[in-house]
Design a protein with these regions (language model features):
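Short loop/turn motifs at secondary-structure junctions
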Residues: 90, 189, 270-271
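A short, well-structured juxtamembrane/interface segment
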Residues: 258-265
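Alpha/beta catalytic cores of group-transfer enzymes, especially the acyltransferase/condensing modules
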Residues: 14-16, 108-256
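Non-catalytic positions within long, well-ordered alpha-helices that form the structural scaffold/packing
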Residues: 186, 267-268
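FabD-like malonyl-/acyl-CoA
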Residues: 2-148, 192, 196
Length: 271
């Protein structure tokens, strides 16, 4: 009988890209090299060269960074599986932070790798276009709890974008609103408030411009029901049906990432 190891997976979101990403994997594992080659072939340009050599500015373009992060995440997962030999990794549940949610769908068999790459490339382009139409910014608030950050947002007009932990919350929205929120949070005693180096107000209502385009491409892709519970960013709760997953992806464009709740759900489930 084949031995199994029960695992749960979490995958990173945008902002984790860095020039040189994936190069060690490609140099040392044929499987990783094949995965990166498939990305190049699918997208029609040398994404792998951009990942390995940059420049930074081009890799930071959201339509490039999103498929790059997905490609490296998928390569890490598949190389790990291969390295386990006769020990099969059986996923109990999977979560991903924002973009990482799409990687969860690939490794869970909900969508194909090639469709996933095309989907996140288009998602990145749509998010960029939305940022041009409705510019905004984001900031990380460290040292205030969720209720306190809600007060900051109600007083400034900013929106909560990522609840990452009890005292690390990212806000998003119109740049003037976020700037005001930064000042209010500092006055309320936040340990640190950091304006993030991003090109738009992601996970806020300013991304609504991208919704129609994302809905269209979601309808063009084949989705399967998932055998593995996918922890939804917008609720921190599991979804499995194809329809639920597509609805979650569309909702996630403008809604807050409930990362703290996602991790807590996994812990409560015995992961």
């Amino acid at each position: 009988m084949e031995a199994e190891m029960l695992v749960s997976t979490v995958f990173p979101g945008q902002g984790s890209q860095v020039v040189g990403m994936g190069k060690d994997l490609s140099d040392n594992f044929t499987l990783a090299k094949q995965i990166f080659q498939e990305a190049d072939d699918t997208l029609g340009y040398k994404l792998s060269d951009l990942m390995f050599n940059g420049p930074d500015k081009d890799l930071e373009d959201t339509s490039c960074s999103q498929p790059a992060i997905m490609a490296v995440s998928v390569a890490c997962w598949k190389v790990l599986n291969e390295a386990m030999g006769d020990m099969k990794l059986k996923v109990q549940c999977s979560a991903g932070h924002s973009l990482g949610e799409y990687t969860s769908l690939v490794i869970s068999g909900v969508i194909s790798y090639s469709d996933g790459l095309r989907l996140v490339q288009e998602r990145g382009r749509l998010m960029h276009d939305a940022s041009v139409v409705r510019p905004g910014s984001m900031a990380a608030v460290i040292g205030l709890n969720e209720q306190e950050v809600e007060t900051v947002c109600s007083q400034s007009g900013a929106e909560m974008a990522n609840i990452n932990s009890n005292d690390q919350i990212v806000i998003s929205g119109d740049s003037e609103y976020v700037a005001e929120a930064v000042q209010i949070a500092s006055d309320m005693g936040a340990r640190k408030v950091i304006t993030l180096p991003v090109s738009g107000a992601f996970h806020s209502s300013l991304m609504e411009y991208a919704s129609d385009g994302l809905s269209k491409i979601l309808d063009e892709i084949d989705f399967n029901d998932s055998e593995v519970p996918i922890i939804a960013n917008s609720t921190g709760l599991p979804v499995k049906s194809a329809d639920e997953i597509k609805e979650e992806l569309l909702k996630g464009l403008c809604s807050c990432v409930q990362w703290k709740d996602s991790i807590q759900y996994m812990v409560n489930s015995g992961v």
